[in-house]
Amino acid sequence: TPLYSSAASDVYKRQVYNWGEYIDPETLTMFEEETGIKVVYDEFETNEIMYPKVEAGSSAYDVVCPSDYMVQKMIENDLIQELDYDKIPNAKENIGAQYYEQAAAYDPGNKYCVPYCWGTVGIIYNKTMVDTPPTKWADLWDEKYADNILMMDSIKDSFMVALKKNGFSSNSLDESELQIATNDLIAQKPLVQAYVVDQVRDKMIGGEAAIGVMFSGDAIYVIGENPDLDYVIPEEGTNVWIDGWVI
């Protein structure tokens, strides 16, 4: 990837586009102090926000952290370049082989992506507001939680929830199954307090909602901040995701 230098200060820069709360700001400061490279750091909430910005080329990002399915799309559309592992030996030394094996499902040969984080999508709930721990995705349609439900502002994840609720594959392309999921999401809308991504953390910590959809990494954080919260994976199953670094 090219080096970007300031004519005034001759300081090298790297432009990074990443999920919110994915790198401690102190880590960025340490990197800048150790390398002399300035990090220009932007955050996104969903892959669907990130992709068109990268595709348009309006911002010259050097490094981006998309999810598995989006890595595959970026490879297919020639938006990212192959990695030279000779220049990043720590990528193989410090990351377990099992993660590369999982990533090979969407990046054959691990040519384009270094795995960074993985997790699940599940239900976060407040034990003081939910009498019985949720066990099914359908619990997000329970009318007793009206105006206390938080859904993800993400087409992919919301459809995953609705598809799994009905016993379908989260990757279904069947039109009839997708229509059933669509109808369910429309029917659920009057019960939903808000469609959120990063805001779900503060809302659940503050006791502003009873139940919602959350990534497992966020769940670990919010449970640490509010012991009244708990996280479950519904019995119908869920999506396991991997986010990784690409150039």
For each feature predicted by the language model, list its residue ranges:
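Periplasmic-binding protein-like
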Residues: 178-187, 225-246
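Envelope-exposed proteins and targeting segments
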Residues: 35, 119-121, 243
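Short, polar/charged alpha-helical segment
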Residues: 17-40, 44, 74-75, 123
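Extracytoplasmic ligand-binding site segments that recognize negatively charged/polar headgroups
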Residues: 15, 60, 65-208
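Structural motif
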Residues: 44-56, 190-196
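A ligand-binding cleft/hinge motif common to bilobed small-molecule-binding domains
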Residues: 70-73, 211-228
